[in-house]
């Protein structure tokens, strides 16, 4: 039997890690030889989740072609967000809830993408469709992913399907959604011990009409906890622009209590962000009122503005 590795995007978040583990458990129950791995370090929120449910973190890998010939992707499809040697392996499955971009294969594959707030919402359906029981531990991981991606159902990406899935998973996991959810989000929003690199850890790269754009996001309970270190943050952002040849680096600092954000933008295309949101950056900083979702409120708007 051919072994498969399953993983989410680089700079993994809670959905990426929990989806990889959950997908692997589903496939193992069906007799597959599969292992969940990760493409980067865990953030503090995900570390809290794994510790809470006593789950070992997936193994860290930098390449996969040296181990397997087939892989499955969760929570992403764009090649620049995936493992560096993605072109050297065959993608046999994708389960995702993002736009489809910069993705093609030479062979047919299983592709499941739905416009919901979280990948594990889709995975719960797959467990049910295949009549595979969701364990208490996996239910906890899947619930955590939904809470994370929907900001405890406050994000505009959240759908009724996500809420229903979360309720079902909470029953299996035997946790109180609101109490556990706030504890989890606050664990992720504590930036007091984070390095500057860790502040920018949740970053994704996009190709927007030929421009290289990187968008990082962090959730906090007070944006000033990050803005007080703005000089260090901007220095690292600038270094990333040089190292990666980026045209724009946008850092979205989201207050999970007010559901507003502050943006820091650096690069030759910062005017595109100003046009997209009708704001003016002063010393690289501007308010982004009501913006909490990179997937729904940042990427589509910037993509459309770059295309003008």
From Swiss-Prot:
Mn(2+) 1 binds at residues 9, 13, 75. Its EC number is 3.6.1.1. It is found in: Cytoplasm. Its main location: cytoplasm. GO terms for molecular function: inorganic diphosphate phosphatase activity; manganese ion binding. The keyword Disulfide bond does not apply. The keyword Metal-binding applies. It comes from the Bacteria. Keywords: Cytoplasm, Hydrolase, Manganese, Metal-binding. InterPro entries: DDH_dom, DHH_sf, DHHA2, DHHA2_dom_sf, Mn-dep_inorganic_PyrPase. Mn(2+) 2 binds at residues 15, 75, 97, 149. Coiled coil: none annotated. Its cofactor is Mn(2+). Binds 2 manganese ions per subunit. It catalyses: diphosphate + H2O = 2 phosphate + H(+). GO terms for cellular component: cytoplasm. Belongs to the PPase class C family. This is Probable manganese-dependent inorganic pyrophosphatase. It comes from Listeria innocua serovar 6a (strain ATCC BAA-680 / CLIP 11262). The gene is ppaC.
């Amino acid at each position: 039997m051919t072994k498969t590795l399953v993983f989410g995007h680089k700079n993994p978040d809670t959905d990426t890690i929990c989806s990889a583990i959950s997908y692997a458990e589903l496939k193992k129950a069906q007799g597959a030889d599969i292992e969940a791995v990760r493409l980067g370090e865990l953030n503090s929120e995900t570390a809290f989740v794994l510790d809470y449910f006593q789950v070992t973190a997936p193994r860290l890998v930098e390449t996969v072609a040296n181990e397997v010939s087939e892989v499955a992707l969760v929570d992403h499809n764009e090649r620049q967000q995936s493992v560096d040697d993605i072109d050297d392996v065959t993608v046999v499955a994708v389960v995702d809830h993002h736009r489809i971009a910069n993705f093609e294969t030479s062979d047919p594959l299983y592709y499941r993408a739905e416009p919901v707030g979280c990948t594990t919402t889709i995975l719960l359906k797959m467990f049910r469709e295949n009549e595979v029981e969701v364990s208490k531990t996996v239910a906890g991981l899947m619930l955590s992913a939904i809470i994370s991606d929907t900001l405890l159902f406050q994000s505009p990406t959240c759908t009724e399907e996500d809420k229903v899935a979360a309720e079902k998973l909470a029953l299996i996991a035997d946790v109180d959604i609101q109490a556990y959810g706030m504890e989890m989000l606050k664990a992720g929003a504590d930036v007091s011990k984070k390095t500057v690199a860790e502040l920018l850890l949740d970053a994704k790269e996009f190709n927007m009409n030929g421009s290289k754009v990187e968008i990082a996001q962090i959730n906090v309970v007070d944006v000033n906890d990050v803005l007080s270190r703005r000089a260090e943050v901007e220095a690292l952002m600038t270094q990333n622009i040089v190292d990666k040849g980026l045209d724009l680096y946008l850092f979205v600092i989201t207050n999970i209590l007010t559901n507003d954000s502050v943006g820091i933008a650096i690069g030759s295309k910062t005017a595109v962000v100003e046009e997209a949101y009708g704001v003016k950056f002063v010393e690289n900083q501007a308010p982004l009122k009501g913006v909490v979702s990179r997937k729904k409120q940042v990427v589509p708007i910037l993509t459309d503005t770059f295309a003008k």
